[in-house]
From Swiss-Prot:
NCBIfam families: PRK05305.1-1, PRK05305.1-2, PRK05305.1-3, PRK05305.2-1, PRK05305.2-5. InterPro entries: PS_Dcarbxylase, PSD-A. This is Phosphatidylserine decarboxylase proenzyme. Binds 1 pyruvoyl group covalently per subunit. It comes from Rickettsia africae (strain ESF-5). Is synthesized initially as an inactive proenzyme. Formation of the active enzyme involves a self-maturation process in which the active site pyruvoyl group is generated from an internal serine residue via an autocatalytic post-translational modification. Two non-identical subunits are generated from the proenzyme in this reaction, and the pyruvate is formed at the N-terminus of the alpha chain, which is derived from the carboxyl end of the proenzyme.
Length: 231
């Protein structure tokens, strides 16, 4: 029984219906044409790969902000946070992480703290690699207060192909760094907004690993010690 539970654990539940559908179509195609059946099996295997949900070794410290997603650090700039969160016209550092269709799409909590507000904003579906995607695309914005009292924002953004954002958080949730909280299907972007004086530990073009890569350290001016936990 444990083996079956472990199997389902490594696949995100959002993928179950897709995998089952692909497998059924593959079976039907194979009954008519062997080559079509092979193509269907390849598509099913890719679907399983897309919805993979691997464990990560998460650095644990109240000072740290970790990447909420796998992908490329596409942009780091000063920008206003999503207006729907009511933070006013105070610019923050925005770290944008672009996910292609081959990245793990499960999203993770970037820091220890409490969820203060959530807001879903329906929008367009521009290519998530474009700067305007942060403003105009469909998004799910989350405001949290870290254990150190810092307010940070993380935003799931739909892309050209991604048409489904899943966020399992609720206002008032106490959350831990690296916990899984949602997924964006089929290519997307995640933005993280941090206070302007935050010490960043990533650079543009760097590959980020969700739940592992340290984006920033609020205690950078002092020696920060932390441990790792598998999640």
């Amino acid at each position: 029984m444990k083996q079956y539970n472990d199997l389902f654990k490594i696949i995100h539940r959002e993928g179950y219906i897709f995998i089952a559908s692909f497998a059924l179509v593959s079976f039907l195609l194979a009954s008519f044409n062997e080559k079509l059946g092979c193509i269907g099996c390849i598509a099913t295997a890719w679907c399983i790969y897309f919805f993979r949900n691997p464990d990560r070794f998460v650095p644990i410290s109240d000072d740290l902000v970790i990447s909420p997603a796998d992908g490329i650090i596409q942009e780091i700039k000063e920008a206003l946070p999503p207006p729907e969160l009511g933070l006013g016209d105070v610019e923050m550092i925005r770290v944008s992480i672009f996910l292609n269709i081959f990245n793990v799409h499960v999203n993770r909590i970037p820091a220890n703290g409490k969820i203060l507000a959530l807001h879903y904003n329906p929008g367009k579906f521009f290519n998530a690699s474009l700067d305007k995607a942060s403003i105009y695309n469909e998004r799910q914005s989350v405001l949290m207060e870290t254990a150190q009292g810092q307010k940070i924002v993380f935003v799931q953004i739909a892309g050209l192909i991604a048409r489904r954002i899943v966020c399992d958080l609720e206002e008032g949730n106490e959350v831990k760094t690296g916990e899984r909280y949602g997924i964006i299907r089929f290519g997307s972007r995640v933005d993280v907004y941090l206070p302007l004086k935050t010490a960043l530990l990533v650079s543009k073009g760097q590959t980020a690993i969700g739940g592992e890569t340290i984006i920033a350290d609020f205690g950078r001016k002092k020696t920060t010690e932390f441990k790792f936990e598998r999640k």
